[in-house]
Amino acid sequence: KCIKKLVALTLAAVLALTMLTACGGTPSVQDTTEATKQIVDNINAVRTENGLSALEINTAVTDVAQKYLAVQEKKKLNLISEENYKKEMRELSAIKVAGRSYIGYLATTTDSSGEKSLTKEAWQKTYDSGKVNYSDYRIVHSADAKYVGVVMKQISNGKYITVVVTY
């Protein structure tokens, strides 16, 4: 009887740990998936049609985007104070990649996967907006931008966070 209880408790503990850490065999954050590649293709279509160079997907920039996503997730789930959120965002914007400074940034939270809202038409609208002080505008408008990182994740409240960063 004692062994059965021990096995049952161990199994329950393993199951609980699996649920808490989301170790179910599938990654919670995608790397370069079809969805994130589609977003980059949409950005590059707008850039090249407007005489700018296409952005290159860069692993280091994608890592920075991953860090931005983690901060956004904490904010959306109310796991971080506004003060700490601003501090972490400032720290992230100071990161350099290949000697380059951050140029553009966009984080969206949507009910469905990010590529459904970050279409070529949406990026063209951003390009045409003339909002030069907006970080998302610089993603499609900056001639200095060379690298891009895009990450997407469905968080525990069912929403999707998509982050785009350019350097």
Spans of model-derived segments:
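C-terminal motif of bacterial Sec signal peptides marking the signal peptidase cleavage site
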Residues: 18-22
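Short, well-ordered surface patches within globular domains
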Residues: 31-96, 137, 145-148
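Alpha-helical transmembrane segments
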Residues: 10-17
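Short, contiguous strand/loop micro-motifs
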Residues: 6-7, 29-31
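Bacterial N-terminal signal peptides that target proteins for export
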Residues: 1-10
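Bacterial signal peptide processing site
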Residues: 24-27
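A well-ordered secondary-structure block
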Residues: 87-167
